Amino acid sequence: MYLVVGLGNIGKEYKKTRHNIGFDVVDIIAEKYNIEINRQKFKGSYGEGRIGNEKIILLKPSTYMNLSGESVIEAANFYKIDKENIIVIYDDMSIDIGKLRVRGKGSAGGHNGIKNIIQHLNSDIFPRVRVGIGQPDENVVNYVLGKFSKDQREIIDKVLAMSAKACISIVEDGVTEAMNKYNGVKIEV
């Protein structure tokens, strides 16, 4: 069983913003596998389904981003999911737009949502899909809560689809295979 967590902020004003990439990827997976994310529990919205023979729980925490760990630990404990089977998808400013990076473990890299998840899991050993949003030329908060330009949106939509495939690959083939397949790929217009 896998827990697939997309990080984002709840509310219409945050829809399609850079910081909501995790929610967007989870929505793509939900659509592909006909999983309704319509249940409220674990301080978030979730749905259950399958990828092949593997049961998955899709979770969108409704806590503030920097408290995402509260939602993740509740769901992981309820379903008794190993840390190695918790996949977290989130935006990353240290990666260029058009790229993603799959990792099996690692530090928070300055992302407060990931920092909180590491704290609650008491471990940094969980797979993650880091989606590049690029470096801001402006205030960081305004940047991550801002929307992509039209040109960027074209690229990001393709990267979101690729990120969903990377998550599916982690479930079906393992982290190493997903890393080999998706790390280093760059999408351009």
From Swiss-Prot:
Where is this gene product found? Cytoplasm
Which residues are recorded as binding tRNA? Y14, Y64, N66, N112
Q: Where is this site: Stabilizes the basic form of H active site to accept a proton?
A: D91
Q: Which GO terms describe its cellular component?
A: cytoplasm
What reaction does this enzyme carry out catalytically?
A: an N-acyl-L-alpha-aminoacyl-tRNA + H2O = an N-acyl-L-amino acid + a tRNA + H(+)
PROSITE patterns in the record, alphabetically? PEPT_TRNA_HYDROL_1, PEPT_TRNA_HYDROL_2
Q: Where is this site: Discriminates between blocked and unblocked aminoacyl-tRNA?
A: N9
Please tell me where this protein is predominantly located: cytoplasm
Biological process annotations from GO: protein quality control for misfolded or incompletely synthesized proteins; rescue of stalled ribosome
Keywords of the record: Cytoplasm, Hydrolase, RNA-binding, tRNA-binding
Instruction: Report the active site residues.
Output: H19 (proton acceptor)
Gene Ontology molecular function, alphabetical: peptidyl-tRNA hydrolase activity; tRNA binding
Give yes or no: UniProt keyword Cytoplasm. Answer: yes
If you read the UniProt record, what top EC class would you report for this enzyme, in one word?
hydrolase
Any Pfam family matching the protein:
Pept_tRNA_hydro
**EC number(s) per UniProt?**
3.1.1.29
Record carries keyword Metal-binding: no
What the record says about family reads:
Belongs to the PTH family.
Q: What does this protein do?
A: Hydrolyzes ribosome-free peptidyl-tRNAs (with 1 or more amino acids incorporated), which drop off the ribosome during protein synthesis, or as a result of ribosome stalling. Catalyzes the release of premature peptidyl moieties from peptidyl-tRNA molecules trapped in stalled 50S ribosomal subunits, and thus maintains levels of free tRNAs and 50S ribosomes.
Q: Which NCBIfam families does the UniProt entry name for this protein? A: pth
Record text on subunit structure and interactions: Monomer.
Q: What is the name of this protein?
A: Peptidyl-tRNA hydrolase
